[in-house]
Each structure stands twice: as C-alpha cells, then as structure tokens.
C-alpha cells in the first residue's frame, strides 16, 4: 500500500538501544518498528490483546530475517497497572529502556451527540492516560543514566479539528500538551520528549475507517487542498528514528508535523 520508503539512517544509529513501540505490530507502529530496527535498535513491540499477537509476530519475523532484534509484550495501555507492569518486565528482561514511542491509539468515528461516557473514557485512557503512565514508568528507569527519549504520536487534527472525532482529537490535543509539559519539567534529567503531529497515513485500518465513514454519511472523503498523497507508516518511522537518535540531541519539547503539508493547507 502506498509508495516505497527507503531507510536513510546509518544501520548503527540506534545500535544497542532498547526502543519500546506501543502498537508496534500494525499500521503506523509497524513502520516505526521496521525503521527503528533498520537503524540498529532493539525493538520491543507492545500489543493490546492476544488476537493482535499475530501482527506483532509478523513484524518481528521481518525484522529478525533482516538481521535485526525484536520482541513483543502484551499490555493494555489503557490500564495504569498494566503500563507499570510491562515496563518493569521489559527492564528486567532487557536491562533498561532507552526510548519510548507512544504510538498506540484508537479512533472511532462518532458524531459529537453520540459520544457516550464509555467511548470518551476509553479514548482518553488509551490515547492520553496510557502515554502518561508509560512515560512515568520509563522516566524512573532513565533518570539514573541521565539520558533517554520519548516520542508521542499525536495528530495535526488537534490543531485543525475534524468531523466525528471530538473524542479522539481531544485526547491527542492533550497528548501534545503532555509532551511540552513533560519536556519542560524533566529537561534537567537529560531525557528528551517530543511529539509527531501525524497527517493522513495509508494504513489498512485508516483506509477501512474512511470507507466505513463514507458509507455511514453517504459523503465521499475529501482530502484538504494542497496536501500531498497520503503518507506511509515508514514516513513516521524515519521521523521517530531522528527524534530518538543522537542526531536530535538538541531537540526537546517540539511538536513535529509529518503530514505532507496538511497543517499548512
């Protein structure tokens, strides 16, 4: 799906670094996992439920076949105790966490009037609370080394709005604010925190959601004028590699738009 993207970083840019990628087995997360592995990172994929393990295993197989390192852990990031548990397990098994990529997220298209407390609470739990609790856990591990990187995957829609996405966009707007606030507070620890504002990416789930929404509303999806073709997961992966590598050692508290021009269109 989409165009082919070539890795542009040295194969040792992330050598021996343990990089946790939530939702790293599907969609955008799979592109992030592959790009991190291609740069030498030891990829740790977090998947939410047993039925998703097959997708994580597929990405792991691809990475290992290419000579990389990857493993997977089960965790529902929408549950605080699960976030604490999984980071503790990873640190026990790997010795440390060098970088965390809070990529896992959900987005169910629902009209504002139809958003129930359950829908609202689940989006906040997965898209905002999960990154908060995971970040708390990894920062405790990173502080003694005075080095580490956290990247949150947010969206350009947090600054533009969007139909039937009030719950999703609100949670991602909170994630952007979490990014800048964390970066400010823990700057002296040597841990950097940045976010990527993601544009439209051609993933299986995204394409299906657009098709379902068109069927539901009876209106075709219209991309914003001036926006380049939809991105591919590896576009986000390259940006992540930059933000967790030494190439960005002077970058923290930044909200980086990787969107093909959507934010300015």
Stretch-by-stretch model annotation:
Residues 57, 114, 188, 199-225, ...:
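A glycine/serine/threonine-rich, flexible loop-to-helix segment
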Residues 25-27:
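Conserved glycine-rich cofactor-binding loop
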Residues 135, 171:
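Active-site helix of classical SDR
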Residues 140, 184-188, 249:
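Alpha-helical segment proximal to the catalytic Tyr-Lys
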Residues 97, 111-112, 116-124, 217, ...:
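Substrate-binding pocket helix/loop in short-chain dehydrogenase/reductase
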Residues 2-9, 160, 241, 252-265:
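Short C-terminal tail/terminal secondary-structure segment
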